[in-house]
Regions:
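Pyridoxal 5′-phosphate
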Residues: 1-394
Length: 394
């Protein structure tokens, strides 16, 4: 197979054709600054309002609760830092988990250095938060719970509705990083008692460099970027109009196609998982076997290095990942895989495959055969595997 097979859609996605078409006029024709008073620019202000409404509808929110940002990392930083600053007179304790994206973990570490206390919850072997652990971690000084909707590496979907209920019961703000979940699973902020939610355009066939933070009306969150009065004086800077158009168009498309698209993805994902587990010995599926994103499969292969597997897959035209794209250059094993209890040597042999609506069965079959061939080759070169075989033959 000579073409590239892209199975790293958790890292980023191809921008959909209709999204590109919707964006182009805002580069070439409707390029006015939305803050300007003349009618040429006011069209852009109206366009932003329309896309804000589209995104709000997708969440069951109000348009004035959607704030555009440069992406998921900014939204996460804003949610944690600005909440901590606004509510520091009420308390200084934040609860999150050990499997969050680094945009949350590193922000939490920053806050710890600035006088806040952070509890990092353990998860079970499937990456699921234990609700009793969350209850036990709550203190009188707890001001924020931040737990991701679905994990970017192993695909586990957290019990968000139950977490939201616990937060509401104790009068604590609840933020969720929904960068991987938005557009892949239905989300309703009221049903789940979500006070803040982060999302990003490039994870749902939209452009890079655009995202949003949902902030429930009444939440006292401080401005994150100071300057002009954009985003209702909470996030200064001339709006990225083409990006906002792309984000809104991608959101509408994701909601419109969700049922058919995710059903197809889940069917192929299950086929991929079943064949790999059956045909590649000493392989483990990471993440919840059922409560997981429809396009995510994450495996650990014993006796091999994940980086070697990735390089050899790349030579066959297959794009995959050993974990988060934000940490793929690191030689350390995934913090997520360590958090679910995998030993270092097994965590090192991980592979994440994330499908798209364009992924075909023919491509999946080719990937499976390639994995079988490469894993066999790498194991035959492994002293650890050789020792294991000798011991089992005694």
């Amino acid at each position: 197979m000579n073409k590239v097979i892209y199975l790293d859609n958790a890292a980023t996605t191809k921008v959909a054709g209709e999204v590109v078409e919707a964006m182009i006029p805002y580069f070439t024709e409707n390029y006015g600054n939305p803050s300007s008073v003349y009618s040429f620019a006011s069209k852009n202000k109206e366009a932003i309002t329309t896309q804000r409404e589209v995104i709000a509808d997708a969440l069951g929110a109000k348009a004035n609760e959607i704030y555009f940002t440069a992406g998921g990392s900014e939204s996460d930083n804003w949610a944690l830092k600005a909440t901590a600053e606004a509510y520091k007179n009420k308390g200084n304790h934040i609860i999150t988990t050990k499997i969050e994206h680094h945009a949350i973990l590193h922000t939490a570490e920053y806050l710890e250095k600035n006088g806040f206390e952070v509890t990092y919850l353990d998860v079970d072997e499937n990456g699921m938060v234990r609700l009793e652990d969350l209850q036990a971690a709550i203190r009188p000084t707890t001001i924020l719970i931040s737990i991701m909707y679905a994990n970017n590496e192993i695909g586990t979907i957290e019990p968000i509705k139950e977490i939201g209920a616990i937060a509401k019961e104790h009068g604590i703000l609840f933020h969720t990083d929904a960068v991987q979940a938005f557009g892949q699973v239905p989300i309703n902020v009221d049903e789940c008692n979500i006070d803040m939610l982060s999302a990003s355009g490039h994870k749902l066939n939209g452009p890079k460099g655009i995202g949003f933070l949902y902030i429930r009306k009444g939440v006292k969150i401080r401005s994150f970027v100071h300057g002009g009065g954009q985003e209702r004086k909470r996030r200064a800077g001339t709006e990225n109009v083409p990006g906002i158009i792309g984000m809104g168009t991608a959101t509408a498309r994701a909601i419109r196609t969700m049922e058919e698209r995710t059903t197809k993805e889940a069917k192929l994902r299950d086929y991929l998982i079943s064949r790999v587990l059956e045909e590649v010995p000493y392989t483990k599926l990471n993440g919840h076997p059922e409560k997981r994103l429809p396009n995510n499969a994450n495996f650990s292969f014993r006796f091999i290095e994940g980086e070697s597997l990735l390089i050899m897959l790349d030579m066959k035209g297959i794009c995959a990942s050993s974990g988060s794209a934000c940490t793929s250059g690191s030689l350390d094993p995934s913090h997520v895989l360590l958090a679910i209890g995998l030993p270092h040597e097994i965590a090192h042999g991980s592979l994440r495959l994330t499908l798209s609506e364009e992924t075909t069965k023919e491509e999946v079959d080719y990937v499976i055969e390639s994995i079988k061939e490469i894993v066999t080759k790498l194991r035959n070169m492994s002293p650890l595997y050789e020792d294991f075989v000798k011991k089992t033959q005694k």
